Amino acid sequence: MIQQQTMLTVADNTGARKLMCIRVLGSSGRRYASLGDVIVGVVKDALPNMPVKKSDVVKAVVIRTVDTVRRPDGMCIRFDDNAAVIINDDGNPRGTRVFGPVARELREKNFTKIISLAPEVL
């Protein structure tokens, strides 16, 4: 579960390292984001001379959560960190690489470009 003020690792090569969630997009008053949900965040830590700078406000999709996610077949999946990939307004990733595994739930939410860039899909 990702909520406001949650710090996430950025799992792409846009230059951002840490992202803080400031809004969960969706219906009015939505509190938590899970795998495949879009959030608005502010970059808290970034590499120099890269496209994304510190204090930039960006959209991102959650690809890994520490909170357990239950699948319809009864299987539970959990990751070691909370991670997101920065996306543009069209829903395409701004980076050209994705680091670490991503969840299969992203395919159901039409983030197939992120799935194709990922080295491993769980």
UniProtKB/Swiss-Prot annotation:
GO molecular function: large ribosomal subunit rRNA binding; structural constituent of ribosome
Superkingdom field: Bacteria
Entry annotated with the keyword RNA-binding: yes
Keyword RNA-binding applies: yes
Any single GO BP term: translation
SUPFAM superfamilies attached to this UniProt entry: Ribosomal protein L14
GO cellular component, one term: cytosolic large ribosomal subunit
Keywords on record: Ribonucleoprotein, Ribosomal protein, RNA-binding, rRNA-binding
Family under the similarity heading: Belongs to the universal ribosomal protein uL14 family.
Role according to the record: Binds to 23S rRNA. Forms part of two intersubunit bridges in the 70S ribosome.
Subunit-structure text: Part of the 50S ribosomal subunit. Forms a cluster with proteins L3 and L19. In the 70S ribosome, L14 and L19 interact and together make contacts with the 16S rRNA in bridges B5 and B8.
Name of this chain's protein: Large ribosomal subunit protein uL14
Organism: Synechococcus sp. (strain JA-3-3Ab)
UniProt lineage: Bacteria, Bacillati, Cyanobacteriota, Cyanophyceae, Synechococcales
